[in-house]
Amino acid sequence: MMARWCVGWPAAARGGRDELTWQAELTAHAAGEFSMAAAQANAVMEDQAQVMASPGATLVGVYDGHGGPDASRFLRSRLFPLIHEFAAERGGAVDADVIRKAFLAADEEYLQLLRWSLPNMSRAAASGSCCLLGAISGDTLYVANAGDSRAVLGRRAAAGQTVAERLSTEHNVASEEVRRELAALHPDDGEVVVHARGAWRVKGIIQVARAIGDVYLKTPEFKRDPAVQRLCSAAAAVELARPVVTAEPSIHARKLKAGVDLFVVFASDGLWEHLSDEAAVQLVSKSSTRRGVAARLVQAALGEAARKREVRRGDLRRIERGVRRHFHDDITAVVVFLDLDDDGGRRARRRGRVVDSSSSSCSNTPLDVYSLYNSTA
């Protein structure tokens, strides 16, 4: 099964002397190479990411958790296997329908897991996760998103320069468009989005309108659980006529063009709150080597976070996990290079199964960066 391919992680390197950073410098995939990196800010890492490479396809997942690590860790273990299951029903081909079914099935599985496990998993009932998926199948790239992680393409423009093109749709209620959409879906609820603690929030609690998990915003049965109320006191006041958060992803498909579509940056919002789309694309395109490029993105974001708080980057390294969350969020970045040939993809003609158990490999970020380097933690 695919689940066993997605355990562990490739040989890691500390990001400088910072025990809260990690990277996998460069690894091959079906249509090129990829680089991964992460930086931990929370007491327990809430971001997760993974890349599965097989001869016929490449899958990229970035899962930005909130309210604890449970939902993002669940996605790390279940999303790729679900894609495999639904793709197998269609002869092995991945497409938008397969991806949508996998998102919704993952959300339902998480809900059922909690129903079976309460009160032992009450902490997990307060957890949710944004979910960003990239799937390269032949010469087509699918990008699916629920939440506010982001995928940005580095594309060669007519004049030869590399420009940024955003590929994902975000669902953060900081956007007036997202707030209007949510209000239209809930015309009888004047408090479906409120401004609380300095930001717009769904029911005054979370900032995203789409996510996996956050079950207390989808069904009233969990808000009544005493343990859930202890973990998320605001849940007790939530009145639900219907779910106010959904796992429905926004999905975009793109035919890849050789020599034009160069690379894609997949990252959690911890990166994007400090780097613009254009800044990230320029950093990647101007790097002298691909090796370690994701770590350079993460370091650039950390440098900007330090600058905003008027501290030196070296001082930021000495701030412990948990406390560091006051300076930046967990940050995860995956840079996927697209080495395409003239007919659309180095292996575009291989349109067999999405995955092959004999030749697939899966790379993950660590469950917890601090614990990776501190085995007694």
Swiss-Prot record:
InterPro entries: PP2C (IPR015655), PP2C_BS (IPR000222), PPM-type-like_dom_sf (IPR036457), PPM-type_phosphatase-like_dom (IPR001932). It is an enzyme of class 3 (hydrolase). Mn(2+) 1 binds at residues 64-65. Its cofactor is Mg(2+); Mn(2+). Its EC number is 3.1.3.16. It catalyses: O-phospho-L-seryl-[protein] + H2O = L-seryl-[protein] + phosphate; O-phospho-L-threonyl-[protein] + H2O = L-threonyl-[protein] + phosphate. Signal peptide: none annotated. This is Probable protein phosphatase 2C 61.
